[in-house]
Amino acid sequence: MTTNVSPAQTGTTGTNLLDAANGLAVVRVTIGAMFVWVFFENLGKGLYSPGGYAGLINYYIKASHSPAAWKAVMGLAANHAAVAAPMQGMTELSLGVLLLIGLLTRPVAFVAFLFLGSLWMSELGTAWIWELLVPVLASLGLAVGRAGRKWGVDAWLSQRWPPAPWW
């Protein structure tokens, strides 16, 4: 009996590392596309205007089961919707584009994890619980893994500057 082990496999488990990298890249591109899609969907709904943003946040304050402290934070955002609305729009678009192209994937995925976690907390009780929890956890997986090293700009950057923790 012979065992064929290619250089791309680990020594003990036989797991193909290239397949794992491809899987992380698919998740990265999917989460990035989700952010870009949501940006354009919300733009079309007028949710990045001060009135649209404040209306949505006030709905979450009234309808969600978020803790009182989080509702106070949401109230602050609603009261400053002229600043918060465009910031949220640019955050969603920036996270999406950076994840799609695979640039600075690890820090961007961590910011996406925090951002999606805050949205999940804001919508708590108003939507299906897994609707945002799955992308939250997927973003955390991208931050821990090296999802940008496949099909992304980070793959090129990691060849030029291998010890950098950003890719």
Predicted regions and their residues:
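Extended, low-polarity transmembrane helix blocks
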Residues: 1-94, 101-167
